[in-house]
Amino acid sequence: VSSPKRIKKQITQELTEVKKKYATPRRTEIVYDHQSQTEAAPEDETPDYPVHLFLSHEGYLKKITPQSLRMASDQKYKDGDGPFLQWEANNRDDLLVFTDRQQCYKTRLSDFDDTKASVLGDDLPAKLGMDEGESVMGMVLPGDYSGYMIFFFENGKAAKVELSAYKTTSNRRRLTGAYSDKSPLKALLYLKEDREIAVYSTEPRVLIVNTALLGVKTTRTTQGVALLTLKKKYVLDTVRFPEETGITDLARYRGRSIPATGALLKTEDSDDKQLSLI
């Protein structure tokens, strides 16, 4: 075809036919090279400042600023309640709350109001929307999610799980299957690196071992490995750090391999007033 007019007419006809056939408007946007760079994520404008956290045995949490704590440090608790755990943290920090129902609740400290020592604090089960009768077993400030959790079960087993297994990309608040349900959970511990721990049974016996003996798992619901060999009718009771036990002869209770029975707790090494760190 040599005529420019005829060429233009042919193109016009073809475009008209295409328009009739594909009448739906464009659903995507043309992106040019200068637009292809990923836009920076919006900056977190949540105020960040140091805070002190106080958790009671019955699950009440207080977030108190250092200034407020200096003015009044005597903590108020309900009758029959008392101090369980406390940390120093920052307002933007994440918080993981583990319960007795194999669940983990993820929240941020900025979701909690600053309070004073003279109040009871937030009731965590109510604040986080826990199931009826669900109780707090422990809390963790995950930071960059390095390190690992260790779960200690009534049957003498312990499960060492990478903390990164609890990191989520979504805003999911509740994680189910946070740990194994094969035996009741007696204690949990968050460690950045391996160290010695003292494991107590109800006999009472004590076994002091290094957590390096526990193999690390990536599956949250792993049953763990046998740690404490138990006689019938006895169970794993609690876990402490050796320096907090009041035991004078630590060598008596040390084990080089697992599982092990530990040694009977001497009267002079028993201290009912010692608080578990877990």
Language-model-detected regions and their locations in the chain:
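C-terminal interaction appendages of subunits in large macromolecular complexes
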Residues: 1-278
